[in-house]
Structure formats: C-alpha cells, structure tokens
Amino acid sequence: MCRTTRQGDLAEAAFMLRATEVGLKLARPIGGDVRYDVIVDNGRERCRVQVKSTSSLYRKNVYQVKAARQEHYGNRKAPKAVGYLASEIDFLAAYLVPEKTWYILPHAALRGRKILTLYSAGHAKKGPCAEYLEAWDLLL
C-alpha cells in the first residue's frame, strides 16, 4: 500500500472517531465513483465530507492541503488538479497530523482554491482559515 493511501485511510479513521465523539452518525460510500469519503448525519440533514490530511510543514508553523482531485484528460501523461464542485462535496475536513488538529470547511469556503494554507496553533497569526479550526459545530 502506498504511503499516501495509508495516510488517507488513517485520516478518514481519525475523522470518523472524532465525528463520533462529537455525536455525529456516519456512513461510508461503497465504490470509488463518488468524490466524498464520509456521509455525516446530524439528525436533520446529511452532508458529504471529503477528508484530506498532511503530515509535513510547508514552512514554519504553516501546512498546505490539496483541496482538489486528480483527473487525467485525453493523452496527457500528468494528471490535472481539479477543484471540488458543490455538487460533489458539502465539506472538506483537513487534518494536520502532527498537530492532531482539524479544519472543517464548508464547500463555499474553498472558493475554488486547489490548495489550502492552514496555520498551526504555534503560528503568530491566525491564518486565512482560522474560523474553521475545529469547527465541528458546522456539522452538528
């Protein structure tokens, strides 16, 4: 199993554990034809969540997470990064592995970005996504 697949599986498991701890009900899609990893049921609605993670710093106290999927077009050898559509996911959950910290971003907060810059707790500034740090209430 490649390292990124293993890290992704571990991040999904960590998300499901934390989401269960805050009182959410969860389901996983079967098959690989959907863009989300977990379905969250809060008793009123169901949300599609894409889980991402990173374990390495981009620069001091700053992480980056890909907020895109890879698609192959025609004869292109290299895949192209394509941002998630609102019709594909409702939330992106980004896990900073060394920090054991989650960012829970609604799709609208992605604003078409393919890379998210996320600040650690030790950073002097709050960062562009600070309001989504441990924002589990958005899923409740």
Language-model segments: what does each one mean?
Residues 91-124:
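Domain-level recognition of nuclease-like catalytic cores that cleave nucleotide substrates
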